[in-house]
């Protein structure tokens, strides 16, 4: 999106910085009929223009404290967000130590991981081995998205 900086130009408005991961099949038994979006509540103010219209309250109060859910259809949101899936989303946010945004659409799951720094940026004043360890740690966290989130979908009841 862009915001007018002056009458002649616009500057980009940054809504998110981090990694985006797309899983082509969240759960081979389920298809999301429309979008279901799950946002960390801490970052919700930045995403007002990018969400679908219907806010959803789940029956999990801890999940509701940490996440905002929006969907095109309430029934579909409850179909996708089983108690186990909500627990795994919470576990993934804890592993990320940052803001997490998820969107379910048809068979796909889009996961964005907001991190304070670019895990692949090279710093001159930090030893190479320390940077290598940080990159290995960051990529392990990104791989955990599949282990945590896809596992949740595959083992959730119909």
Task: Set out the residue ranges of the language-model regions.
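Charged, low-complexity intrinsically disordered regions
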Residues: 1-158
């Amino acid at each position: 999106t862009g915001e007018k900086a002056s009458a002649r130009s616009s500057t980009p408005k940054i809504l998110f910085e981090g990694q985006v991961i797309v899983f082509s099949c969240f759960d081979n038994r389920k298809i999301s009929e429309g979008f279901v979006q799950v946002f960390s509540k801490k970052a919700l103010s930045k995403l007002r223009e990018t969400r679908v219209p219907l806010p959803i309250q789940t029956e999990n109060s801890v999940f509701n404290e940490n996440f905002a859910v929006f969907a095109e259809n309430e029934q579909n949101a409850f179909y996708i967000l089983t108690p186990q899936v909500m627990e795994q989303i919470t576990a993934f946010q804890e592993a990320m130590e940052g803001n997490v945004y998820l969107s379910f659409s048809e068979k796909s799951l889009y996961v964005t991981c907001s991190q304070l720094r670019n895990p692949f940026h090279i710093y001159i004043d930090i030893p190479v081995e320390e940077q290598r360890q940080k990159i290995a740690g960051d990529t392990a966290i990104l791989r955990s998205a599949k282990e945590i989130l896809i596992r949740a979908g595959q083992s959730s009841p119909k």
